[in-house]
Amino acid sequence: YGSTMRAVLEKVRPNSMSQMNAVQLYRPSVAQRQKEMLNLSLQKLEEASLSAQSSTKEEASLRMQEAQLISRFVAKARTVVPKGEVILNESNIDSVLLEDGDVINIPEKTSLVMVHGEVLFPNAVSWQKGMTTEDYIEKCGGLTQKSGNARIIVIRQNGAAVNAEDVDSLKPGDEIMVLPKYESK
């Protein structure tokens, strides 16, 4: 407690399978704040669905059904327990002060890239230098019909999430997440 991340990592004796450039930090105080922000967002979503105006009887009926669906979603979402992950930047790891209760995880090296979301067969694919995001998606059967012009995100092993369009090259341990396209009324 009060020590820096760098000081702690210097005391660690990694083995050959330790992925030291993807260190993960989980912090209870961050998890608590994430939960507060999630609850606030859910409250606003619920309020917006319940206060939506309708001009016809049919529209009012649709809005009521929509509000019920949103209320069920909100009830489920309230049970989510945030991890409290802090995404670390290698360049300023010296300035990260540790707090009581922090958990440091050093992931194992892997030779896989996970692909999930709106793909036909979500799967793990062996990493190959030069393969693109699209190549990995094709190895999983391609996009589903629901994907439309879906947003694709790459989640790095250290927890950082990056728009796939901004990724020059994929690394072992990356995850490709194809988010579904949401159709609004």
What residue ranges belong to the model's regions?
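Ser/Thr/Pro/Gly-biased, low-complexity, turn-/loop-rich segments
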Residues: Y1-K185
